[in-house]
């Protein structure tokens, strides 16, 4: 049903966002250590 599809999409989006956040976080940490 529609609910299942929505849940599936929400999970995919959450995973993608988490990946992006991890990348940004890693960049931030590296930049901080470079200072």
Swiss-Prot record:
The keyword Secreted applies. One of its GO terms (molecular function) is toxin activity. Expressed by the venom gland. InterPro entries: Cupiennin. The modification Glutamic acid 1-amide is found at residue 35. Keywords: Amidation, Antibiotic, Antimicrobial, Cytolysis, Hemolysis, Neurotoxin, Secreted, Toxin. GO terms for cellular component: extracellular region. It comes from the Eukaryota. It is found in: Secreted. The keyword Secreted applies. One of its GO terms (biological process) is killing of cells of another organism. Its main location: secreted. Monomer. Interacts with CSTX-1 (AC P81694), CSTX-9 (AC P58604), and CSTX-13 (AC P83919). Belongs to the cationic peptide 04 (cupiennin) family. 01 subfamily. Has antimicrobial activity against B.subtilis, E.coli, E.faecalis, P.denitrificans, P.aeruginosa, P.putida, S.aureus, and S.epidermidis. Shows insecticidal and hemolytic activities. Probably acts by disturbing membrane function with its amphipathic structure. Synergistically increases the insecticidal activity of CSTX-1 (AC P81694), CSTX-9 (AC P58604), and CSTX-13 (AC P83919) by up to 65%. Also inhibits the formation of nitric oxide by neuronal nitric oxide synthase. This is Cupiennin-1a. It comes from Cupiennius salei.
